[in-house]
Amino acid sequence: MGKRILVQRRGRGGIQFRSKDHLKIAPARYPQDGMDNLMRGVIKEILHEPGRHTPISLVELENGQEFYYIPPEGVYEGQEIQIGKGAEVKTGNVLPLSEIPDGSLVCNVEIRPGDGGKIARRSGTYAIVFSHEGDKVILRLPSRKEKLVDARCRATIGVVAGSGRIEKPFMKAGIKYYHERTHPKRWPVVRGVAMNPVSHPHGGGSHKRPGKPTTVARTAPPGQKVGHIAARKTGRAKRRAATKR
């Protein structure tokens, strides 16, 4: 009788591979009704959500509506923020890209107007408003690539809070264990060549190499689909091609 390998179990979606939804507070998105008018609000709380690499802030608007958004560095509880057209260009405020000057650092940028924010949401990240071209704006992303987006898309002025998160070492495996438990994945990750042959196609033998070609077809069965899946190139030729780019 065969044995299902780890990638098959992950694809089935057992409880250890699922997101810990009961630990989540709420999605961090901009309100839908703040596209064409100016709204004011107050940051009521700055919270920590397990599994999220940034703080999350609860904002209460003048009309009593509440929403959560990703705070930039420098904001504090009780601070007043502005959202929408005509807002002041100030850290923590949310404006359409058409009203943000060139060279400004922004975070939680929308890709499409009204989607709530998709770009530069991780701790310490930001995008740069590179230039304005009519009804479009060129953004320089954290990856240094440039992207053309609609000028009506909203963004938060500033850099996402928590920039020094990765500078502190874990020091102990137990701390790392509890950190990884909040994420929808299994940890630690074991190499296939370190497994038994019954657990992985690369396992077995008194050596730490696969012992067979690691390229498999796109149409391979699930128990065989590990390694370089439908790879055009592997090895030195692939590295040389990447260097030339």
UniProtKB/Swiss-Prot annotation:
Looking up NCBIfam families in the UniProt record yields:
PRK09612.1
The scientific name of the source species is Korarchaeum cryptofilum (strain OPF8)
Q: What SUPFAM superfamilies does its record include?
A: Nucleic acid-binding proteins, Translation proteins SH3-like domain
Q: What role is this protein assigned?
A: One of the primary rRNA binding proteins. Required for association of the 30S and 50S subunits to form the 70S ribosome, for tRNA binding and peptide bond formation. It has been suggested to have peptidyltransferase activity; this is somewhat controversial. Makes several contacts with the 16S rRNA in the 70S ribosome.
Do you know which Pfam families this protein is assigned to? Answer: Ribosomal_L2, Ribosomal_L2_C
Q: Which GO terms describe its biological process?
A: cytoplasmic translation
Q: Which residues form a coiled coil?
A: none
Q: How does it assemble?
A: Part of the 50S ribosomal subunit. Forms a bridge to the 30S subunit in the 70S ribosome.
Q: Does the UniProt entry include the keyword Cell membrane?
A: no
Q: Which PANTHER family match?
A: LARGE RIBOSOMAL SUBUNIT PROTEIN UL2 (PTHR13691:SF16), RIBOSOMAL PROTEIN L2 (PTHR13691)
In terms of domain of life, where is this protein from? Archaea
Give the compositionally biased regions (Basic residues).
230-245
GO cellular component entries = cytosolic large ribosomal subunit
Quote one Gene Ontology molecular function term: RNA binding
**Keyword NAD appears in the UniProt entry:** no
Q: Which UniProt keywords apply?
A: Ribonucleoprotein, Ribosomal protein, RNA-binding, rRNA-binding
Family per UniProt? Belongs to the universal ribosomal protein uL2 family.
**Disordered: annotated segments:** 198-245
Q: What is this protein called?
A: Large ribosomal subunit protein uL2
Which InterPro entries has this protein been placed in?
NA-bd_OB-fold (IPR012340), Rib_uL2_dom2 (IPR014722), Ribosomal_uL2 (IPR002171), Ribosomal_uL2_arc_euk (IPR023672), Ribosomal_uL2_C (IPR022669), Ribosomal_uL2_dom3 (IPR014726), Ribosomal_uL2_RNA-bd_dom (IPR022666), Translation_prot_SH3-like_sf (IPR008991)
